[in-house]
């Protein structure tokens, strides 16, 4: 029985070594993927803003003085750059120092929230740790895209392009609610949503008004579909995920075998014939 337990322990150690190798590969794959994703996010954010300003709300954009148009474009580029920096920071936080943090305060906050993301991948000793690390990282990616779109919509609203009568919180809630059912604007690039928002009219009790709005909504699936490099990076991650899931099943099986063997040994050790 002792030999059986020792063999199971050796099997578990071998699995943990394999997990560490997969974790290293996954960390490297995410570094490549997030670098490409950051570039794609910058491009898609600018493209979505361009179509929103020129096709969705051309009058609002034309009403801006030339200097304000330039400033708006610069601010949009900066938001894209900050989002790209944050995406890579999720996987490389151990290489960043305080002076390299993005300037945007909300981005600095999110970088700190996910400041421990990189460590578990390198130190993962079992498939559960690796799966948790990846789940946290995917949540961080989704949060970054959401924040970039939110800040861009807010910028466009402050510039008078998006309807100003909708408070930013109302717009954000509408975007959240329409995430599953919202439709992309026909004939436009991805990452735009066509929204119809009903608001109460306080001047005339009992009546409400309907506001049509086009807003930016960055979708990871659409960004990956539009960029071959990002899509290839995601495919590599999926291949490693398959290996990690297989290791997880085997690891849990070995853990159960060890528990059974230890319980059997404990029973025999405490049993005595009367």
Task: Please report, for each region that a protein language model flagged, where it lies by residue.
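N-terminal alpha-helical "arm" segments
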Residues: 1-35
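A near-ubiquitous, low-amplitude feature marking generic local secondary-structure context
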Residues: 2, 9, 24, 120, ...
């Amino acid at each position: 029985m002792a030999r059986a337990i020792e063999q199971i322990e050796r099997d578990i150690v071998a699995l943990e070594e394999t997990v560490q190798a997969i974790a290293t590969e996954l960390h490297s794959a995410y570094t490549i993927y997030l670098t490409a994703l950051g570039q794609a996010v910058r491009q898609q954010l600018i493209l979505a803003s361009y179509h929103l300003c020129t096709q969705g709300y051309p009058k609002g954009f034309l009403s801006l003085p030339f200097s304000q148009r330039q400033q708006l474009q610069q601010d949009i580029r900066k938001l894209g750059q900050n989002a790209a920096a944050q995406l890579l920071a999720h996987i490389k936080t151990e290489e960043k120092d305080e002076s390299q943090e993005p300037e945007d305060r909300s981005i600095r906050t999110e970088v700190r929230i996910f400041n421990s993301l990189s460590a578990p991948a390198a130190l993962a000793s079992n498939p559960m740790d690796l799966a948790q690390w990846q789940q946290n990282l995917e949540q961080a990616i989704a949060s970054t895209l959401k924040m970039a779109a939110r800040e861009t919509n807010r910028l466009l609203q402050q510039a008078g392009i998006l309807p100003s009568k909708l408070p930013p919180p109302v717009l954000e809630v509408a975007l959240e609610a329409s995430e599953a059912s919202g439709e992309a604007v026909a004939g436009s690039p991805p990452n735009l949503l066509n929204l119809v928002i009903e608001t109460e009219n306080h001047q005339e009790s009992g009546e409400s008004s309907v506001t049509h709005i086009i807003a930016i909504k960055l979708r990871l699936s659409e960004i990956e579909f539009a960029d071959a490099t990002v899509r290839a990076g995601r495919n590599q991650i999926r291949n490693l995920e398959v290996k990690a899931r297989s290791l997880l099943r085997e690891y849990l099986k070995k853990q159960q075998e060890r528990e059974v063997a230890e319980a059997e040994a404990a029973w025999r050790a405490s049993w005595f014939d009367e």
